[in-house]
Amino acid sequence: MLAGGILLLPLVCLKYNKWNKKGVEMPNTVVIGAQWGDEGKGKVIDILAKKSDYIVRFQGGNNAGHTVVVKDKKFILHLIPSGILHKGKICIIGNGVVIDPKALLDEIDNLKKEGIVVNKKNLIIDERAHVIFPYHKILDSLKEENKGATKIGTTKRGIGPCYTDKAARCGIRICDLIEPSIFKAKLEANLKEKNKVFKKTYNFKGFSYQDILKEYSKYAKQIKPLVGNCSIILNKAITNKKDILFEGAQGTLLDVDFGTYPFVTSSSSSVGGAFTGAGVGPTNIDRVIGVIKAYTTRVGEGPLPTVFPGTTLEKVRNKGEEFGATTGRPRRCGWFDAVVGRHAVLVNGLNDIIVTKLDVLDELKEIKICIGYKYKGCMYKHMPANVEILQKCKPVYETHKGWLKNITNCKKYSDLPKEARNYLDRISKLVGANIYMVSIGSKRSQTLTK
């Protein structure tokens, strides 16, 4: 009997017949990262957005970065859904997102400089989304510094402390920010408590009420025209048979419940976050797609069982440009981990997966896949919940022959070398999900439908 063994049953989407492969209709779809983030969701969302009416970001903050390349121009989006690059689409920042107003307004300005239209007709911010303040960012940094060797690798953008306030029921939401009298009262109450903590615990001087009030009141005026009740808007859209694309940030292994806790983000980056972070019921979702790299990467602290040896690590990191879109930090890279893939399929109920960056492996003679972990003589086919155990697990590999060909110019799936198709078939079988598309480059055109 395999340790940690779980019977995997086929996951069937009740409304899946709404989809057809000719792309005539795009069902209500959730796109989830199936690893530790940075899987290439931005490009996938950009492609799928063509046939969607609404594109919704439902969790996280500006700690995430989605990269999209359009006509050789690179766009990096941190808060605004990737669908903003398509005309006629309505983009929504849901209630599950935590918003740094300055970061959001800077992102809007940068898009406008590139000729992208952003206004109340194509961008709506949910009134229930929580707001990141300067004290969140400083607290994030101070707590991380105090952890020393046990640090978790936060981006220090204030995401975690903002979600902490949300759970503690003392957070300030967008609906509060845009109402001056309410905002003043809540900010004053929060700063009274926060400044005590900063002074007594961290020997930090604290923050000026007047300074924050002045700065954020200015942001409120700019943001107010974009604010709405997105749950009502989305449910009305569903009633009117509109197609909605839900854009996840980070990845399943960073989910606060199902990730490698405590080396996780502070939100639900698995499929459940789409429902609570957008105000849409699960029965209105037709399809769940997981985006997964042809190898594995991770930025920040925490276990990565399949990390490459030195020379392969540098080769893949440089070819794959594996540096964080938000922080610029180099990502750790490793062989494809089917244990991670199975976990993502299981907890998200994935209908399909999209494999990205297959071309990065073009020059490798041999390619390994982790099929399980060994720990104290037992074989694990599923993720151990205890991160201390996971850190001691040894990957069990099978080796596949590389294709040693440039695949970036392939026009259809059948053009891929036999070895590449065999590799993809093996990934599909090991994780328990069908492959829908494969990405072989950063451009929109470098995407193959199976």
Predicted segments, located by residue:
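Non-transmembrane, aqueous-exposed alpha-helical and coiled segments at domain scale
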Residues: 25-450
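Short, Lys/Arg-enriched N-terminal segments with co-localized hydrophobic residues
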Residues: 8-25
